[in-house]
């Protein structure tokens, strides 16, 4: 809250996804102190802690989600009903980080090959991990020597499957696919 309050006091105003789109596609200027707020992973606690601040400062933000979490009904994450309530509040817009979060080609900080890990395992191992890993949509799945362990066709199929699942789940659960897609960092 305090950091956003300082930005507000300095004259920063939030911009929406449409504002950014108009800036790039039409050359429409943004405010001098434009701020685009986005919160990744679609966590329930993020919405709980941020909602009052957005209202107090009259700020807008984008909530990025993984539709895989909708299927799993994981209470840590916002579900479609919650997301609809957020967008109805007028302080939130929807975005996506992709169908799911998974790390591939992972090595620990001692260069031991781990392979593929999900976010839970990543969190449990984080202190032993370095920065040698990649996002599952950004590379071939590789062996410990860096040699692709899948064909180009298999990689394309794996990636296509995830985009199709993203589209199908959002369409079914939310009635639309968010227009904003932010891929998690990759190394």
Where on the chain are the PLM-derived regions?
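Metal-dependent polysaccharide deacetylase catalytic core of the NodB/CE4 family, i.e.
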Residues: 32-35, 55-186
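N-terminal pre-catalytic segment of deacetylase/amide-hydrolase enzymes
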Residues: 1-34
């Amino acid at each position: 809250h305090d950091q956003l309050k300082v930005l507000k006091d300095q004259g920063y105003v939030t911009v929406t996804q449409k504002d950014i789109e108009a800036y790039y596609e039409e050359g429409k200027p943004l405010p001098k102190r434009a701020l685009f707020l986005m919160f990744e992973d679609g966590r329930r606690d993020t919405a709980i802690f941020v909602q009052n601040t957005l209202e107090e400062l009259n700020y807008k933000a984008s909530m990025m989600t993984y539709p895989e979490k909708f299927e799993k009904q994981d209470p840590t994450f916002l579900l479609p009903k919650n997301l609809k309530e957020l967008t109805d509040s007028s302080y939130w817009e929807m975005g996506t980080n992709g169908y799911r979060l998974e790390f591939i080609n992972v090595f620990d900080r001692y260069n031991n090959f781990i392979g593929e890990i999900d976010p839970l395992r990543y969190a449990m191992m984080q202190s032993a991990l370095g920065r040698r890993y990649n996002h599952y949509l950004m590379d071939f799945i590789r062996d410990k020597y860096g040699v692709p362990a899948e064909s180009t066709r298999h990689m394309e199929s794996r990636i296509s499957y995830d985009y199709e699942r993203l589209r199908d789940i959002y369409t079914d659960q939310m009635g639309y696919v968010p227009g904003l897609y932010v891929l998690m960092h990759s190394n």
